[in-house]
Amino acid sequence: MNVIKKQIARLFLSSLFLPSLLLLNISNFSFAELPKDIQWETNTDSPEWSSDKALKGGTMRYSIPSFPPTLRTVGPDSNNAFRSNLLDNQMPLVELHPNTDEVIPLLATHWAYDKDGKTVHYKINPLAKWSDGENVTADDFVFALELNRSKHIIAPWYNKHYTEQVIDVIKHDLHTISIVGATPKPQKDLHIFYSILPRAKHFHQLDSNWVAKYNWKTEPNTGAYQISKIKKGKSLTFTRKINWWANELPYLRNRFNPDAVILKVVRDPNTAFKYFQRGELDTFNITLPKLWHNKAQGPMFDKGFIHKIQFHNDIEQSASGIFLNLNNEVLADIRVRQAIASALNFQQVIDVILRGDYQRLPTFHTGYGPYTNNKIKPIEFNLNNSIDLLEQAGWNNKDSLGIRIKNNQRLSFKISYGNKLYEPQILLLSEEAKKAGIEITPYYLDSTSFYKNVIEKKHDMAWLGWSTGLRPAYWQHFHSDNANKTQTNNITNLANIEIDGLIERYRDETNEKNRIQLAHSIEKKVNEKTVFIPATMKTFTRSAFWRWLILPKNEGTKSSESLFNPFNIRFGGLFWIDSKMKFQSLAAKKSGDGFEPVTIINTQFKPL
């Protein structure tokens, strides 16, 4: 047995020099060998974006609008707002630098590109550990592929993507793998399109009971924090790992500083803001103009206990707007969809409610560099055009309230939304739409119920914004494979053969110039279908925070969607808690003293 162990050790150390495709069978091990001529790369020279002045310790408290329906990150009900807190603590092999977009190592120490143009080889950091103390190995990546393909997880998008796009995960030794994609792509894109997060093989048992069994189990992770306490319906606590294995790694040191992060469920945003003003929460997102201009003021701001910051970023824009469900027989008529788009006065929303701070979002994928089709503009507000389209579609009569009628059916829709802060915008839009004879009724659901309603395709219209990626993602949102099915992201149920073909070509295209042209074509075709009505966009984030939360000198990065995200591996975890300042501040507050008010405007990364 000692001989076998020595052989395995030699294989790990000399894997660069082994001939291609040969399988070595030693005892119970089966390792595929690496190609001879690959060149390993790493990057520890890019500038770090944390502060060496950061202090560890303290507890950060912030609010979430609803309790998660599950702790699973795949399967039924997993596509919810809370999931990012779990995924952000599951480290990827590599990431893109938040300022330079260079590839940087995380769970992997090195990577190498295969000559086939579709395979990347990775060396997993041998120090990497799961939160339960087990080592992270190649087996966890091989198992991740098995899990993502399994019918037991009830996740059709994952099943298809990890079968048709991620072709294989090959184990070469305990800490070396290859990820094989379906088609060649530019090198940086390989890390994006064919990425796979590891799954702790020793933790999971894949069978028909998997969904129910793991609904409330805390899955081992590799990031800085793990869930340590759950109060059902009330709060979740994440605790920083003692002696986290990645503490001193480049790009991770001096980050993820609080000892604990408490996520408190506060369903009403107005109530949450009151908790924040009382010091029961440490930070509050005040990006919306109503909050920044109106609510973020008063004694705690004037006396310098609470600071304000507006930080400009340069990121891909969220696809935020109104999604129309084509399973609604009225919305299946494109003339009705175009009429609705023409009846929505977003410029009035920008001028009146958003105080001119926002702009109209042009199209679904905006801010993706050359991949963005800058020729596309949203349908402009035009009541006459809306009325003409409705009359062409046969909606010629009105009831006593002025709402159009056809075949005894009113032109009336519910618009689902999961954040009450958007309610004033929806109400203003619906008032204008009435002038064209369209009734749009606000239908508020708490965020968990809202996501469930949308992902099960039960909505007429839904107002939401999707998180962004580093490249346009068409297949999940607009391919017919994901239409008319629950638990997929094609929430418009668009199914169009021509668009399907373009999306498939886009996925398979190896030439970047051609891929960009295809992206422009897809965006144009989707825009013509009017299944998504773009809302608004902004190029900044705004936060209010108690003065004991300290940010680095530059406050954030080009990619910072939020300055106080405690977990995000790319841009989060930069702040820290100054316990002495907290003690000093609370004493001053009690005695009636104060400090200079602070408002920060950082335009370093403001787009030109």
Residue ranges and their predicted role:
Residues 43-45, 87, 231-236, 240, ...:
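Detector for C-terminal structural segments
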Residues 150-151, 155, 228-239, 264-328, ...:
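Extracellular/periplasmic solute-recognition and catalytic clefts
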Residues 90, 97-99, 194-255, 260, ...:
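Gly/Pro-rich hinge or "lid" segments in bacterial periplasmic/extracellular proteins
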Residues 61, 137-144, 174-180, 223-224, ...:
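Alpha-helical secondary-structure segments
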Residues 55, 123, 158-207, 224-231:
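Surface-exposed binding/hinge segments that line
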Residues 109-154, 178-180, 265, 272-275, ...:
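Aromatic- and charge-enriched surface segment that lines or borders ligand/interaction sites
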Residues 34-48, 58-115, 146, 220:
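N-terminal lobe/hinge region of extracytoplasmic solute-binding protein
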Residues 210-216, 246-297, 430, 437-446:
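Ligand-site clamp/hinge motif
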